[in-house]
């Protein structure tokens, strides 16, 4: 052993390649040992070692002598355990263990620590107990893999479903948010969105949304419904025929005292009757087939199959009898007046009962429900019958001999306002005309009315709350108050006191000037009243109430509670649907009292038969004033001037005439607002057009434009767009027009009507002569204005805007390098003081813009 170790010490260490080769040889030897058995294993190992030594010696001779001879190991001297384990002692620094591990070889080796080897999932585990065990283990591993794969798939699916649910909830929240902004409430009306799309002209989008399959499915469902309906009708007809046959059989059954022979003979007769009926039904069906088909057109006239109009049998009978033909609607009226229409009387009685039941249950709690019920009755019955029925019931409920509860009057007037807005304005007009006619009749005989009779008081209260809920305008109520004040007595004072107590503060709020005029008129009437009336306590109390309303002192009014009426107004607004609102009727007292003579102009399609002389005189007056009415009341010179200025639309012509004929800019502003124009750009166009065509700059147009800009932002945008149009078309303007435009913009910009950024459409990189002249005029007028604080505020507003970096740099460049040139300053012909002031302000503005940019 010492000899071997001595040689090994002299041997050179093996290289990596040689070590790997040696390791593979050891593996082969161990395999041979395993298959050779236990008897001759040592001999085979020794022979293998000798063969290995010989091969290594041959290979070493062939190579260059790079290293010393390898050490020769005698296998007889190596222990068996060391040989089987593949571990050989040597003096080498590196030794590579054999990775060959076998179950039977490990069993022969002495006990040692076994390291647990964790193999990755899916790697086949080697088994030596048999092929069946190995296959079972492989199946178990495969099942485990499939189970784990399914678990992963289920988890991923659940996660995906959860994510989709979260996204759907986010989409629903976003949709609800947008629906809320668009005021679409699905809970109120599910088909409202589709109806909105049809109203907005977007119904064609539904054709793109509905594909062919859905249309086909809908068509099939429609066909199935038709088929089911047809089968049901056939069954009903069959049931009717069977019932008739059973009734006939019951009638034809023989009595108990009849004999069987008689019953048999009767049965034969029944068979004969049945055959006769079948023949008759066949003949009737043939006659029906041969009969000409008659249809009604949209006008109610009967036409045959070829389209010819058939004569009316009633008209033929009347002509044959030599009588005058009476139209159907007049026949119905004559029959109703004569009392021959029992069916109409039954309808009116039933309608009266239904309306009375609804009105008896009317209260603030169920106001919406009762209003919807009466609206439904309006849809099912004629409006004439409904108006007459409701008028009769409301007069019975509210216009009694005793004083009516004020809350009850308010609830009924809210109902009228709802019907006026939801069904039609002619309903409110009908009730207003009825109540005003009653009021006029009571006022004419007011001196004979007893103080205990409260019918006029109740009627005045009804008219007051009709005004409070905006059924008619303030002018009519002022006329009614004037009619009461003209005939001062104890009853009229009581009615005036009732008006001031109920809606006095509302009158003062709606039109203070009209209320002041009315109050002065009433006070003058009181001053001229007789002494007996002046000493009346009711009159003194009315004067106190009038002064309290004048001074806006609500505490002096006894039992004054405006909250109930205000709550009812809010409830009315909430009850109205489909963008409906109460249309306020602007009718005068004379129009209502003479409606039977001159007609109801406030109702569309209303006609009348009045005095022909009055109609002729009215026609003559109309011919005389036709030019004035056609021209809107403007002078011919103004209209000719508007035509020359190319005011080619009615809106522009009216705006132009108002601007030219107004007393001042406030008067022009109010008159233009009363036109209720939807196009704000027309106002801006006309004002700028007039400003440009003046000989010299007129500040009137700038003040008027500033008034509109401060009134609504829509007008501010309209003036901005109109200014941009003029700046973009500046080559079409003359120098006086450019000066007027610069003066107009300078005044509006300094007053904060428009921002300085209105000039951002000017291309500073390619300034032509006219654009340069325009910018020079604007900037010089801005910088030399009197109020220095307004100048700096104008530029500061632009300096704070971070989106206008390029515009601010362009303004700085224009001011420093173009405006302050000696040549340009000489052209301006400024005084030395103005030149220094201009230089000073330009430097300050340049620093302001530069500082904010930093």
Curated annotation (Swiss-Prot):
Keywords: Nucleus. This is Nucleolar MIF4G domain-containing protein 1 homolog. Residues 15-28, 135-156, 217-238, 290-306 have a biased composition (Basic and acidic residues). Belongs to the CWC22 family. One of its GO terms (cellular component) is nucleolus. Its main location: nucleus. It comes from Drosophila melanogaster. It is found in: Nucleus, Nucleolus. Residues 88-105, 242-289 have a biased composition (Acidic residues). Gene3D superfamilies: 1.25.40.180. PANTHER family: CELL CYCLE CONTROL PROTEIN CWF22-RELATED, NUCLEOLAR MIF4G DOMAIN-CONTAINING PROTEIN 1. Residues 1-38, 55-105, 120-161, 217-306 are annotated as: Disordered. Residues 60-71 have a biased composition (Basic residues). Residues 650-764 form the MI domain. Residues 352-553 form the MIF4G domain.
